[in-house]
Amino acid sequence: MRVLILCTGNSARSQMAEGLLRHDAGNVYEVFSAGTKPSHVRPEAITVMREVGIDISGHRSKSVDEFAGQDFDYVITVCDNAKQSCPVFPAKTKRIHWSIEDPAAVQGSQGEGLTAFRRVRDELRARLRAFAQG
């Protein structure tokens, strides 16, 4: 089954979700991530994923346009902006939306920022495990 995970920048939430689902259920799902306005993979996302043994340091931010015309079984949007600007996919594609906070928007110390990234990572992992179990 093919899964595309979308957020705005393809810099944190969707990158972490791609790494998590690929790590936890990559034998079942072919996983991709993209953004409606791609930027760069956040170093904090790389750090907190490394803490749970998942390396996303080789990931790059991709535009959803790179996947135009491709078929996916599921498109999961993990931010409200991506849901609103999500391109049209074939009718057979199941769309799922999770409104996940943007950890990069958290103001405060570096430690507080990493705490926000960890919280988002853990929320994504819980949601993705439930998704994978059907």
Identify the function of each model-found stretch.
Residues 11, 80-83:
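Short glycine-rich anion-binding loops that position phosphate/pyrophosphate groups of nucleotides
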Residues 35, 79, 99-101:
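Residues at the C-termini of beta-strands that transition into short coil/loop
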Residues 39-41, 82-85:
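Short, charged/polar "capping" segments at the starts of alpha-helices
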Residues 69-71:
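Alpha-helix C-terminal capping/helix-to-coil transition sites in glycosyltransferase folds
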